[in-house]
């Protein structure tokens, strides 16, 4: 059984940032050898529904998302003037909860949470939380710390940011990226997004992957209205989605539309991975070694391009969302890397990304 681990690096108000972590799989070479032979049996194309054309991208973007409410990381004990430790939220709040309002007032940032708690005047607060898609109201009594300030005793987050790869843009200006969800690094749960944006980014350094240690992009995100590329409105199991900006639409003038493929059209053999290792998107040769058109499990690839292997060691963090092309069609995007062999990994079908 293969173990998949998806994680996301959190940074707060910084310009230099590591890439969004591509999902990591643990596997042995032998498992790939055993499945490659059976993968040669290709399924006949039966789907007659016309797939749309898109602009395949393959360049890095800065990703910034604000959470829906503030997300609970953990509860904590508070030192008081009574020379004791107290944790008002222990047993009431759980890791991964989202606090969306206090006493009916919306909470969308850490600052709003702190302000509401400090103004409680020692009275109980009603916290409206979302836990695993269930809405709950809980009552909590803040306590005063040694400085006399009222506290809840909870660590929270209200944003995430990183670098990932833009997969495609549709003719009507919608985009898809990453091919997998952004999960919180502490809770392991999918981040609930209130709003977010794509921004221009520049890759400054590449850390090569090696057996047992995935590599990574390290770059700069330019947070400015002049570098804004689009709005993020969804964080799903198939990636992040949104609308591109006027600036991004101008860049599409230099691009060409490409047909997308049905799952059944993806076959074992030669394909290309598009990513911007040297500044501009380029196509690098890969081998599709297993297809699973009848499932949501995606397909498996192996990097064979000598230049890409020399530069990155294979699939690295930040390549999540790199489009895959076969027979002139976009067939999917890279999503996972095998930690024991970074030349191999998983991909999501384009059809699944488009039908999310």
Where are these regions (language model features)?
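Interdomain regulatory linker/hinge segments that flank or connect interaction modules
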Residues: 4-56, 236-284
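PDZ-domain C-terminal substructure recognizer with occasional recognition of PDZ-binding tails
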Residues: 40, 44-51, 61, 94, ...
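PDZ/PDZ-like groove recognition
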Residues: 62-94
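Short, flexible surface segments
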Residues: 68, 95-96, 267, 320, ...
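Intrinsically disordered, low-complexity linker/loop segments enriched in Gly/Pro
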Residues: 83-87, 105-114, 122, 133-137, ...
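Conserved PDZ fold ligand-binding element
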Residues: 88-110, 324-327, 331-332, 336
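PDZ domains, with a preference for the canonical peptide-binding region formed by the helix
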Residues: 101-134, 341-343, 347-354
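Serine endopeptidase catalytic core focused on the charge-relay Asp
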Residues: 143-313, 317, 326-327, 335, ...
């Amino acid at each position: 059984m293969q173990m998949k681990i998806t994680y996301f690096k959190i940074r707060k108000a910084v310009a230099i940032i590591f890439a969004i972590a591509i999902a990591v799989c643990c596997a042995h070479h032998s498992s790939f050898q055993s499945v490659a032979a059976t993968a040669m049996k290709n399924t006949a194309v039966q789907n007659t529904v016309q797939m749309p054309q898109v602009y395949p991208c393959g360049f890095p973007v800065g990703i910034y998302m604000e959470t829906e409410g503030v997300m609970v990381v953990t509860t904590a004990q508070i030192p008081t003037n009574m020379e004791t430790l107290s944790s008002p939220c222990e047993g009431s709040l759980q890791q991964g909860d989202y606090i969306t309002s206090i006493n009916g007032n919306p909470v969308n940032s850490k600052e709003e949470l702190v302000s509401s708690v400090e103004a409680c005047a020692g009275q109980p607060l009603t916290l409206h939380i979302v836990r695993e898609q269930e809405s709950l109201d809980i009552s909590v009594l803040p306590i005063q710390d040694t400085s006399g300030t009222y506290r809840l005793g909870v660590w929270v987050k209200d944003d995430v940011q990183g670098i990932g790869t833009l997969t495609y843009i549709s003719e009507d200006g919608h985009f898809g990226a990453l091919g997998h969800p952004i999960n919180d690094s502490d809770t392991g749960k999918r981040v609930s997004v209130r709003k977010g944006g794509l921004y221009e980014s520049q890759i400054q350094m590449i850390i090569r992957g090696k057996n047992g240690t995935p590599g990574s992009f390290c770059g700069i995100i330019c947070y400015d209205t002049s570098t804004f590329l689009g709005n993020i409105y969804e964080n799903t199991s198939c990636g992040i989605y949104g609308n591109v900006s006027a600036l991004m639409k101008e860049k599409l003038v230099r691009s060409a539309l490409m047909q997308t493929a049905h799952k059944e059209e993806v076959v074992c053999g030669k394909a290309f991975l598009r990513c911007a290792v040297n500044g501009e998107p380029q196509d690098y040769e890969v081998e599709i070694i297993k297809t699973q058109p009848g499932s949501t499990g995606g397909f498996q690839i192996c990097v064979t391009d000598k230049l890409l292997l020399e530069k990155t060691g294979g699939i690295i963090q930040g390549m999540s969302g790199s489009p895959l092309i076969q027979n002139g069609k976009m067939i999917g995007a890279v999503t996972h890397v095998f930690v024991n062999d970074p030349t191999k990994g998983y991909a999501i079908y384009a059809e699944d990304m488009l039908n999310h």
